[in-house]
Amino acid sequence: METFLQQIINGLVLGSMYALVALGYTMVYGIINLINFAHGEILMVGALVSWTVVSALADTGLPGWALMVVALLCAIVVCTLLNFAVERIAYRPLRNAPRLAPLITAMGMSLLLQTLAMIVWKPNPKPFPLLLPSVAIDLGGPVITVTQILILVLTFIILGGLLFLVNHTKLGRAMRATAENPRVAGLMGVKPDVVISATFVIGAALAAVAGLMWAANYGTVQHSMGFMPGLKAFTAAVLGGIGNLAGAMLGGVVLGLIEAIGAGYLGDLTGGVLGSHYADIFAFVALILVLTLRPSGLLGERVADRA
């Protein structure tokens, strides 16, 4: 039971990070029907920018929490500017093109960002310093670290803020109107191009936060680190219902729990043949099952394909 509860905690932390990235996927898809496969690389850039800032300020005497705040702000600025440029240069000219063209462009952009990051930051993994006290709080068997608590609290604050933004602000109404029908929204005074750019910017900010969380939780960063979390976050978005914000949140948490619990018991289930490093299999088995049994996702609705 203790092992199970520990994996629940680990799964909630992992799922929180997946949820933040999945929200970026689902927001963009909900508005322009694009799967932005370069989104995982925004997480990677956020992590590497955070590492750069923390390394540069390591000798200034700033406390760890202050370094984390500065690194987070810098990561958000860089990632939002980068994603804004990606949308403006790579995706906007293809908005009315056949769907295969933007999809291929997104894959190409993913590889381009990985390559540029490898050139700028070099291919070797870099240790991310411990910024918060390495205190493990005993919960009567399972333990949780200060960093994990911060990840959970920050994630739920961000998710609550995002739901408020989408449901109770002028920008949120414009986003929902654009998602429903960009042409009609334009006739009502909404500027679809501005709304779409804002959606990419918000998604990038969420990915930047997730990038810093990932680096702080796992203690290492490198140019290729965004691919697998990005792919799993996409799986989470599909699991919950692509285009549905609540579905992305639920999908992230569910996927994190599946992966963590699976990793904790994989060795026992296979008689020691497979170790926890094979845990990635659970995410993709979940994706296959969802696409087979419920393609619309847990909270998704069956809708007619838009022309």
Where are these regions (language model features)?
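Hydrophobic alpha-helical transmembrane segments of polytopic membrane proteins
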Residues: 20, 25, 77-79, 232-255, ...
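Transmembrane helix-bundle core of multi-pass membrane transporters
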Residues: 93-94, 99-168, 195-198, 261-264, ...
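Inter-helical junctions in multi-pass inner-membrane proteins, predominant
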Residues: 2-17, 144, 165-170, 196-237, ...
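Alpha-helical transmembrane segments within multi-pass membrane transporters and channels
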Residues: 61-109, 116, 250-255, 259, ...
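Single transmembrane alpha-helix segments in multi-pass membrane proteins
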Residues: 4-53, 85-101, 237-245
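Membrane-interfacial amphipathic/re-entrant helices at transmembrane-helix boundaries
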Residues: 1-21, 49, 60-70, 97-101, ...
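Membrane-embedded helix boundary and interhelical linker motif in transport proteins
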Residues: 31-34, 38-85, 265-273
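Helix-loop-helix "hairpin" substructures at the membrane interface of multi-pass membrane proteins
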Residues: 143-221, 245-251
